[in-house]
C-alpha cells in the first residue's frame, strides 16, 4: 500500500527522468518492503520554483534545483533497520537511475495504522495487517 508523493521543481525533470525516479522509488519499495509489483500508488507534483522553497544546505548537504522531496506513507510495523534500509535504497536507486545527486533527496517516511487506510468502499481492508518486512 505504500503511497509515494514525489515533489520536484517544474521544468527540472522531463517525462523520461520522472519515469526513472518513479521506477526507482517503486523498485526500492519492492526490494526493501517486499511490496508486490501491483501495489503501486504514486503522486507526482511539479511545482513552480516560487512554490518549492527550501534551505540551500543542511547537515553538510547541499541542495540544487534538482532537489526531490519524497514522502512515503505505509502501514506501520516495520523495524527501524528496514526503514533505514529503505531510505538508503531509494536514495541509491534514484541517484543512479535519474542522475540525481545523493544530496538532492529529502525523504520522509510516514507509518500509519492499517485501520487508518481505505482502498475503497469506506472499508479499512488492512485494519489487522501485519507488516511484511
Feature annotation, model-predicted:
Residues 1-133:
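Interaction-mediating elements
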Amino acid at each position: 500500500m505504500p503511497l509515494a508523493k514525489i515533489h520536484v521543481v517544474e521544468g527540472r525533470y522531463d517525462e523520461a527522468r520522472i519515469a526513472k525516479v518513479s521506477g526507482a522509488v517503486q523498485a526500492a519499495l519492492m526490494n526493501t518492503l517486499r511490496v508486490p509489483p501491483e501495489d503501486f500508488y504514486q503522486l507526482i507534483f511539479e511545482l513552480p520554483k516560487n512554490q518549492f522553497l527550501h534551505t540551500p544546505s543542511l547537515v553538510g548537504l547541499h541542495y540544487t534545483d534538482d532537489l526531490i522531496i519524497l514522502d512515503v506513507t505505509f502501514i506501520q510495523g516495520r523495524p527501524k533497520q528496514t526503514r533505514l534500509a529503505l531510505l538508503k535504497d531509494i536514495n541509491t536507486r534514484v541517484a543512479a537511475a535519474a542522475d540525481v545527486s545523493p544530496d538532492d533527496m529529502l525523504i520522509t517516511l510516514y507509518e500509519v495504522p492499517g485501520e487508518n487506510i481505505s482502498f475503497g468502499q469506506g472499508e479499512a481492508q488492512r485494519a489487522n495487517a501485519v507488516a511484511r518486512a
